[in-house]
Amino acid sequence: MISQTAQKELNKLLEGNKNFIEGKPTAKNMCLKTLQSLALYQEPYACVLSCSDSRVVPEIIFDCGIGELFVVRVAGIAVGPNVKESIEYAVKKLHVPLLILLGHDDCGVMKYANEQYPEMPEHFQSILKSVYPVIDGKG
């Protein structure tokens, strides 16, 4: 069950996504006063865990302004210790009531992991190890 606060924030994101899909985004939070206040503190209303793919930009997809979302981006949405700690910071310190997991089609990391499975280059191990359970159907 979702809290009333989280539902309210989810509705904002859904409305923003509707604006994006319809090609009618609204300009938000770009005035100098807002930018200056954001230099002092942040008060996002949602945390979005997203792939680092350059085509997936949560602020644009949800038609949000600067400071409205706490965005954690990582290739393949691979959740490791740093990602977990970032999300925990958003929830415990910034008190965001809503966590969104934003995936996408045609993920290059997932394709690469699938092509290399079970062999993987050492420098990709931490990312690919976290997506292999998904490829195996165990995640």
Locate each region found by the language model.
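Catalytic core of membrane glycerolipid acyltransferases/transacylases, capturing the structured
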Residues: A46, R55-V72
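Divalent-metal-activated hydrolytic enzyme cores
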Residues: M1-E43, I66-G67, G76-H95, G108-G139
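Divalent metal-coordination and catalytic microenvironments
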Residues: L13, V48, V72, L101
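Short glycine-enriched loops at secondary-structure junctions
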Residues: S50-R55, A75-A78, H104-D105
